[in-house]
Amino acid sequence: GAWITPAEWDSHITTEDFPTGVPSILAVDSSVDDARYVGVHAAVIDNQAIVKVAFVVQTENEMWEHIERIMADQKVQLAITPTLEIHLPMNLQRRYQTVGYGELLRFSSLVRSMILEGKVRHNGEKMLAEHVCRAVITKTAQGVVLSSQKSPGPIELCRCMTWAVALVSKPKQATKPMLVITG
């Protein structure tokens, strides 16, 4: 069935600006037909994730240009699918992780619960809303997962939002670890 209803998604719109200079996740994916590359950016403010569409472009080159621009902020971490990972620039090698079906399986119900509990905010972008509200969740032997096959249209922005929200909401160490040198 439907993952999130339009009324539910719309009830979490915020006018708050997306924060800068805070730890954040940029999740990137390509559409099923590789005709489109998308990125969703997520950060946490006051214990709530805030998400926005970072880009929707037609070529891989444009995608990398957007990724480089956004990741000029050293606090941004990249979550990218294995298909695109092979072309990851050397300067970003230390700030990324791969995400795919396994992570969707782990995070789909978690992020749905976060949305229903009001822990995910967005600024009402139409395309993101369309992808989120058309996404269909299916039951598998391993759990529930967002299904591109069962959804009546593209959901890559929803997939990226799911990865970004789950990863950015993971508790972080507030202070830098101390370097201890012993005798």
Locate predicted features.
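Mg2+-dependent endonuclease catalytic cores in nucleic-acid-processing enzymes, primarily RNase H-like
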Residues: 46-143
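Short hydrophobic beta-strand segments
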Residues: 25-29, 78, 122, 147
